[in-house]
Curated annotation (Swiss-Prot):
Protein name: Uncharacterized protein AF_1118
Taxonomic source organism: Archaeoglobus fulgidus (strain ATCC 49558 / DSM 4304 / JCM 9628 / NBRC 100126 / VC-16)
Keyword Signal set for record: yes
Signal peptide (from-to): 1-20
Keyword list, A-Z: Signal
Amino acid sequence: MKKLLVASLALLILTPVALAEDFSMDAEQLAVVLLKNTISNLEMSNKFVEILDNSGSDSVYQNLWGVIYGALAVMAVNNEVTTALLDEVSKSQELSSKVGDAINSLGENSTVVFGDVNGSKGLTLILRKESEVLQNGSYPYSDNETLSEAYARVVAEFTSRSVDFIVKLFSKIDEAWV
């Protein structure tokens, strides 16, 4: 039984390594998926603001300042944790060298990771493909909307709702902070 378990575990560990180099995908399809994800994220943001507006509570925007304060307090303490960690790294030549080596590696491979101005590799390739997909105008987002139409719609809605949200939030600043 132990041999079977060890063999199964070895197969599970080695299989992804063996198959990892075989992955290949049309960059245009990745662009479509990324655009759909961006559109749906903006739609969710719009829905969240709509929910706040429909909550029936006049104090929701005033109380949102409490949520913002809480998030800022957590971030401030988290910054203390990060600073303590960075202090420890800075005291060690070995750890500082590892961080430096990582930055050097990223810089030396910047066109592999980030791409070039022609959009022929790295992240710029995906962004160029997104642009091509949007300019093509024929990729469906839903039954009655293309990706281009959906993206334009959701950006306009997001802009409008974000401005409304900011106005409502800041109109309660004097009630939240006395």
